[in-house]
Amino acid sequence: MEPAAKTNPRMMRLGLPMTIDVWRNARIDFGATALFSLFNVVLNQFYVAFAIQEGASNVQVGLLTAAPAIGLLFSPIWASIMERSNNPKPFVILPNVIGRLLLLLPALFPTPSVYVAVAIVFQLLMGIQAPAYASLVSRIYPSDVRGRLMGYVRVSMGVLMIPLAYVVGNWSERFGPSGPLIAAAIAGTISIILFNSLHLPKQPPLQGAGGSKKARFSFKEQWSLVSGNRILALFLAATTLSGFGNMLSVPLYQIIQVEVLQLTNIQIGYTRVAYFAALLLTFLVAGWMIDRIDIRYTLLAGIGAYAVVPMLYGLWGTYPAVIVGNAVQGIGEAIWDIGIMAFVLRIAPGREAVVFGIHLLLFGIRGTLGPMLSTSLTTTVSLPLLLVVASLFGWAGTLLFYWGNRKQQL
């Protein structure tokens, strides 16, 4: 790669020095992300609400919320296979093409069981691509500009998602969810096809692992990375506690919005506008922070955000509290999106897929147990009490990350 770097001069784009290939990748990433924005709004902000409106029970809401985590339970296995293949791109592209087209099914067959089945299959596919994407990003952008470019790309998505949340809310309120679901499937598929045109630098062949011939999965090998790295172990413990609190809460947010407060799709759209506005601003600020100061300060804010949101819902539970809670949730999710990936890339260079796979496995466990536990308890425990307990998990994770990292050097 050294000779290539010498023959590929740097230029200034977006206030950053980058090569022609990096600038080309950034433009492709911007375009693909713009198209993905509609898919993201429909799937992540309205899908569960659509299912509830179609008659989904609390248990089905729990399954819908747990679906992303169920898919990630197998991420370490896929991470091991991908790492030995030394080519993450197919592991990102193919699952996304299939998964995004699946959104056509609930549009054509709008029953709660179809919503649940599609969500689980889609997230199983995302469990394949998630660790591969972490490795792919490390090849798309160099480390000196990665945080800011990732932030800029997410900002562009946030700019589009703010009006899209309002549009989807109005569209579905007037004509039902089928139209937004079909449009999301089409836009998402075109997006991943465009993303496939990214240029990746050539990688040296794997040394000593036997390449793809020995794509064996080993928990011992993967967890050995954690046992010898205190910072990584603290990170995993803190995100597990805070993330468990978040996953306990997420299905309860949907139940409160639709069943308790009986918000219309237009009102839900306004809460999503608050979410995306905060997401947008945080992507911009967090990307700048990641490249300039100790990344653990940024992560601390993201971990703490997941303690604040259930407290707002549990102690107040009004429509204004929902709007503020959505904004704080946007802050947390933006930091978890780019902050955690940047953190893993920094502390485990070359092994980011495996470490990210472990992180996703833990998310899979807490994300499966959390929603199922909270929704099953709704008949015997009050929603405010469940949310306060979830908030306590978030605060425990925040304090652990803070105290554990006070004297540690990254």
Regions found by a protein language model. Give the residues of each.
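Flexible cytoplasmic inter-helical loops of multi-pass small-molecule transporters
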Residues: 6, 199-221, 409-410
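Helix-loop boundary and gating motifs at the non-cytosolic
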Residues: 6-74, 78-82, 231-272
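Transmembrane alpha-helix termini and helix-breaking/packing motifs in multi-pass membrane transporters
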Residues: 45-49, 53, 80, 84, ...
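Helix-to-loop junctions at the C-terminal end of transmembrane segments
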Residues: 74-87, 172, 282-294, 378
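Structural signature of the two symmetry-related core transmembrane helices
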Residues: 90-105, 185, 297-312, 391
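Helix-loop junctions at membrane interfaces in 12-TM secondary transporters
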Residues: 106-119, 313-326
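Intracellular juxtamembrane helix-capping segments at the cytosolic ends
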Residues: 128-141, 335-348
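Symmetry-related core transmembrane helices of the 12-TM Major Facilitator Superfamily/SLC fold
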Residues: 179-197, 385-403
